[in-house]
A protein has these predicted regions:
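Hydrophobic, aromatic-lined core segments that form the binding pocket/scaffold
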Residues: 112-319
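Structured, beta-strand-rich domain cores
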Residues: 2-30
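Short, charged/polar micro-motifs that form catalytic or ligand-binding hotspots
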Residues: 27, 104, 255-259
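Internal, well-ordered alpha/beta segment that forms a basic, Gly-enriched binding/recognition surface
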Residues: 28-127
């Protein structure tokens, strides 16, 4: 969402961060900080129905669901939006080619109706996170012919695992030199990787199979598991509400492909968090592993760029 940034140090941190505090803020006050720092963690997305505000999950307060509710910060948010407009007046987001699928264009008003179904599914308290995602996906197919859901979900096939491994390598690069680089999907090289490379997932300099990470224990039916589900649900809800997953909000993908990409981020985060837990010597995934994972993914996914071939490939695989 941002086109300007302060160049980070080799360890990925701001050069003005000292003892986990902003040196400029601590010594000179908030009013002299760079404008881009003052905007964090707010993100503004201008759409045909208005400006939608979300907050970045790179913020510790957002990750922990702490701080003052946005509804109680209206005056501050108006000031932040005015600053945002001074930095990004030249940036235009194109929303005039919205599609439910590649061959089904829809109006913005029709999209908002579909979005209601997604958000309603994500806020259902009687469903697990997986069931919420399935229900949200089903709501997008209400006007399409969708094959019935099988009684049991088959394990991922070879191509599915390769696609996940390709996305995993781009969103969670193991080489530190790629941590601070934007994610650029080259369709041809991505397709070659799908065909030629075995599906391996690297976390903290160790390679794992899909099964090793997917089968690693997670907390179940306790307070921590609820916190994890809440964090992941909030992440999904924020991307949908902010329109950061399709069209002008993400690589001009169709709504269905864009949402299914969001859905795929869940197993990617599950595997990365498992890898972090294994590296710590833990017996199961803990909330801290998921928080670190969500923060890294947020940074990468918000700056992802797809070329035309990649977008076409995603539309095919993610329908």
């Amino acid at each position: 969402t941002y086109t300007h940034a302060i160049r980070p140090t080799d360890d990925g941190h701001c050069p003005f961060l000292i003892n986990k505090l902003c040196h400029i803020h601590a010594t000179r006050g908030e009013h002299v900080k760079p404008l881009i720092c003052g905007l964090f963690p707010y993100s503004f997305n201008s759409t045909p129905s208005g400006v939608y505000l979300t907050v970045s999950f790179r913020s510790n307060a957002v990750l922990g669901n702490a701080g003052t509710p946005l509804t109680e910060q209206i005056d501050t948010l108006k000031e932040k939006f005015a600053v945002y407009n001074t930095l990004y007046t030249a940036r235009s987001v194109i929303w005039d080619a919205i599609k439910l699928t590649v061959d089904k264009p829809i109006t913005w008003e029709q999209y908002l109706d579909y979005e209601k179904g997604i958000l309603a599914a994500l806020t259902r308290e009687d469903l697990s996170l997986k069931e919420k995602i399935f229900a949200a996906s089903d709501s997008l197919f209400k006007d399409l012919n969708k094959p019935p859901m099988p009684d049991t979900i088959a394990p991922p096939k070879g191509l599915d695992k390769k696609f996940l491994a390709g996305l995993f390598a781009l969103y969670f690069p193991n080489d530190p030199k790629y941590l601070n680089k934007d994610v650029v999907f080259n369709g041809i090289s991505f397709a070659l990787d799908l065909a030629l490379k075995s599906p391996k997932f690297k976390v903290v300099n160790r390679s794992y199979s899909f099964e090793e990470l997917n089968n690693f224990p997670w907390p179940e039916n306790n307070a921590e598991s609820k916190e994890i589900d809440d964090l992941l649900t909030r992440f999904l809800y924020s991307r949908v509400f902010g329109k950061w997953y399709f069209g002008g909000g993400f690589a001009q993908l169709s709504v269905i492909a864009g949402f299914h990409h969001l859905a795929l981020l869940m197993p990617l985060m599950r595997m990365h968090a498992a890898g972090l837990a294994i590296a710590r010597g833990a017996a199961k995934v803990e909330l801290i592993d998921v928080m670190v994972t969500v923060r890294q993914l947020e940074e990468k996914v918000q700056e992802a760029v797809l070329d035309g071939y990649s977008a076409a490939l995603w539309e095919l695989i993610l329908f």
